[in-house]
Amino acid sequence: PACHWCHVMAHESFDDDEVAAAMNAGFVCIKVDREERPDIDAVYMNATVALTGQGGWPMTCFLTPNGRPFFCGTYYPKAAFLQLLSAISETWRERRAEVEQASDHIAAELRSMASGLPGGGPEVAPELCDDAVAGVLREQDTAHGGFGGAPKFPPSALLEALMRHYERTRSPAALEAVARTGNAMARGGIYDQLGGGFARYSVDGAWVVPHFEKMLYDNALLLRAYAHWARRTGDPLARRVAAQTARFLLDELGSKAPADMFTSSLDADADGREGSTYVWTPVQLTEVLGGDDGRWAAEVFGVTEAGTFEHGTSVLQLPADPDDAARLDR
């Protein structure tokens, strides 16, 4: 897996003899590769979101023998996971009928959710779209872009929906929301300021520190959103990010895969360390670029002695485009 916390849980728990013994004693354990079986992943991710209000990977689901979920979560540290295994085993032994009843109810709710809007047909009324957009705009973070709080995932589908709403209604609020979020992500640490392409999500509300894995589907969807924004408005940042994201997809995920295929993701970890290929210190910049250029780059990209990530390292950000002409005149 590309996900950092998937690596952590695999090492802490699944490779641990004590945890393995507890799992094998009380459960039939199945590990699903979501890239090979996205259909299975989608079913249990819907259950995880429905039961917890959020989703993510690693995804941990406990099922009845017929495959119906009754308890779901994501990452658990070893001690908490051992406690959870014990509690689930005890509950299954002593209250099995209640668990099965709950799982039946959850399965019924998931089937209802999957059936779509009540009375829905091929046409969606404009009024329904307007109400949906109004609800989305109420949730936007007007200070940092995006919708809701941390962690923040790139809202590619919402950006595309807002652009389509703008095309239909010429709503300035919809376009402003796209510009606010598009700018914030493209200038933040979630976007690779050197190599192009977006990371999976931001752990904070200001798009500063990402979870560093890069996913094919995220970047394909964001390419579409930024290209749509650029085509409709001519915004130079949108044009630049769309071009860089396309180049990242072709060079990093396309050229290194078999013919006519793409690599599905880039790992968050390198040499066992999260994000090590994406973070910098002021000293590293001066070592690579020299004293003057290194200090200038640190200022441009927000690289400080204190750092924004771990151990005094900083994720590159680009709060404003550099004045290259003034730099050359020095």
Q: PLM features: residue spans?
A:
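Replace the tail clause
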Residues: 1-330
